Amino acid sequence: MALPKIEEVRQLSDEELAEEIIATKRELFDLRFQQATRQLENTHEFKHTRHRMAQLLTIERERQLNINQSSSTSAEEA
């Protein structure tokens, strides 16, 4: 599995982004569980999944800040 591109994440809608975050959190949980029970064969999947989670959370935070910046800018203009 190749590391995902940030451009792919930016194209997601807000709802898709939220769903993807939940799915990735679940995947991390499953990977941790597999590791604890010594069933995990591909340990590099942790890196890929954590990288994906970081991308998703970064895009989510950028969108929150853009919303706040645009609303505060319009409030300052008034």
Swiss-Prot record:
Family: Belongs to the universal ribosomal protein uL29 family.
Pfam families: Ribosomal_L29
GO biological process, one term: translation
NCBIfam families in UniProt: L29
Superkingdom of source: Bacteria
Protein name: Large ribosomal subunit protein uL29
Keyword line: Ribonucleoprotein, Ribosomal protein
One Gene Ontology term, aspect cellular component: cytosolic large ribosomal subunit
Gene3D superfamilies per record: 1.10.287.310
GO molecular function terms attached to this record: structural constituent of ribosome
